[in-house]
């Protein structure tokens, strides 16, 4: 065991040394007194078919291996070096490994339409001017670990058949991956972007943007994520659009931070869209989206943030009503879809709250007419069928107010019955004014049964008030039973 403990650090260091892109030191750590090699000598050596193996050199002049050149069949390894002139290798096929790790490119670099049949290694490189990899074909793994692009760069229409690793890479200016195809896995873990575009890009395998930072505009419009995608803990400083994109697997946006509007209009999530603990400082636009299941547990919204669910089709939308109640862009169909969603989740109280707000906003926006008057009655009497307390209040209020009226207005008399004489017998004698308790008892009897107690009766105009209370009693009691049944029986 002691021997194993001593050997373990050595074995780990050797294993890390074999990871692509991690075995080359930073260019800054190398000596500045590097030998100078002319670009023409490099071209001549490539033409001779001899393998190239240089480290810590300076390549002077323009290195131009243009179209029409036969496939480069030998391996090329130029690491931790500096290219002072332009590097132009267009429509060139590299049959063996191309290893340019740790190099600094002081001028423009172009690998347009190149084919890399084996590994293409650009880890820890620094492109000070434009870098163009448009229409490039990577048949093997492509590693850009900790690579820095200080100017505009392009990977448009590029195809990555092997793993594409942009771990810890930095893009200090515009970069586009428009129409690119990632047929295996892709990693942009902890990458830093300014303006970036993945328009109509295809990710056939798993891809991660975990902890990536998007400081400029980020465009993922019409992008196809055919497998799982990870944006966990990513941060978007400016506008981000995923409009018309499709997600075929798990879409993990947990702990993400959108500081501006997050546009997901027209997207399609075929699997779980996980946004737990996300933060939205701007609006969340899901208009026209198709969601299989979207989870928004513990999300945080800015005070001015809005959520647009217009024309959104979702099977399961997991977010508590208290989180979004003041942020919904009003749309009747969206509200009713949320009500149905909450009922499917068996969150019945939240379904009631959502429906109540839907009706209240509709009432505020409706023009005056019989329809609005009917809505007002429905609101005040039973809270649109989801507020039992409203109906209970009106029952108690009606009993109390009529009791006060009968008592204060002396609207009822009471008989004192001597012996066991029947009502209407001559020995029945009217008594003095009834007490408030008797008036309240009389009001309860009229409200619940429309019949006065045997020893009391209304007088004068109060007969009509007693009849009106009986009618209101039947109305409110019937309404109470209906609303209570709807709330208790789900």
Identify the function of each model-found stretch.
Residues 12-22, 408, 412-416:
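Short, compositionally biased low-complexity segments
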Residues 18-375:
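N-terminal leader/targeting and pre-domain segments
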Residues 370-388, 415-475, 479:
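Pore-loop/selectivity-filter region of tetrameric P-loop cation channels
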Residues 388-410, 473-479:
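Selective detector of the "anchor" transmembrane alpha-helix that sits immediately C-terminal
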């Amino acid at each position: 065991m002691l021997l194993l403990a001593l050997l373990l650090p050595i074995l780990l260091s050797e294993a890390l040394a074999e990871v692509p892109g991690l075995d080359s030191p930073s260019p800054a750590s190398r000596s500045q007194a590097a030998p100078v090699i002319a670009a023409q000598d490099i071209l001549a050596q490539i033409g001779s078919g001899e393998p190239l193996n240089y480290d810590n050199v300076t390549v002077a002049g323009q290195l131009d291996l243009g179209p029409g050149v036969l496939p480069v069949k030998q391996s090329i390894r130029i690491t931790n070096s500096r290219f002072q002139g332009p590097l132009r290798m267009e429509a060139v096929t590299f049959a063996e490994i191309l290893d340019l790790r740790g190099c600094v490119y002081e001028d423009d670099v172009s690998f347009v339409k190149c084919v890399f049949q084996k590994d293409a290694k650009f880890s820890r490189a620094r492109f000070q001017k434009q870098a163009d990899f448009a229409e490039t074909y990577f048949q093997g793994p492509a590693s850009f670990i900790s690579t820095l692009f200080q100017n505009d760069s392009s990977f448009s229409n590029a195809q990555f058949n092997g793993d594409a690793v942009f771990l810890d890479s930095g893009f200090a200016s515009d970069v586009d991956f428009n129409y690119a195809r990632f047929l295996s896995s892709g990693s942009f873990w902890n990458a830093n972007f300014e303006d970036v575009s993945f328009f109509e890009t295809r990710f056939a395998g798993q891809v991660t943007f975990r902890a990536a930072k998007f400081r400029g505009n980020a465009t993922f419009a019409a992008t196809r994520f055919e497998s799982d995608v990870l944006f966990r803990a990513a941060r978007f400083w400016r506008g981000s659009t995923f409009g018309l994109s499709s997600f075929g697997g798990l879409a993990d946006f947990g702990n993400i931070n959108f500081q501006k509007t997050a546009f997901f209009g027209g997207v399609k999530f075929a699997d779980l869209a996980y946004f737990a603990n996300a933060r939205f400082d701007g609006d969340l636009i899901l208009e026209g989206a198709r969601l299989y299941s979207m989870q928004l547990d513990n999300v945080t919204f800015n005070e001015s943030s809005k959520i647009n669910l217009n024309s959104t089709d979702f099977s399961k939308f997991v977010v508590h009503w208290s989180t979004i109640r003041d942020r919904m862009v009003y749309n009747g169909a969206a509200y009713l879809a949320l009500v149905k969603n909450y009922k499917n989740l068996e969150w019945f109280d939240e379904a009631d709250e959502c429906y109540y707000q839907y009706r209240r906003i509709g009432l505020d926006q409706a023009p005056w007419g019989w329809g609005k008057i009917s809505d007002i009655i429905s609101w005040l009497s039973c809270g649109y069928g989801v507020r039992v307390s409203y109906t209970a209040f009106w029952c108690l209020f009606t009993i109390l107010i009529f009791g006060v009226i009968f008592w204060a207005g002396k609207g009822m008399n009471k008989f004192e019955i001597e012996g066991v004489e029947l009502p209407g017998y001559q020995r029945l004698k009217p008594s003095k004014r009834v007490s408030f308790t008797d008036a309240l008892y009389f009001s309860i009897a009229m409200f619940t049964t429309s019949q006065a107690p045997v020893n009391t009766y209304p007088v004068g105009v109060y007969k009509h008030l007693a009849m009106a209370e009986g009618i209101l009693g039947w109305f409110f009691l019937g309404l109470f039973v209906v609303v209570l049944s709807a709330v208790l029986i789900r």
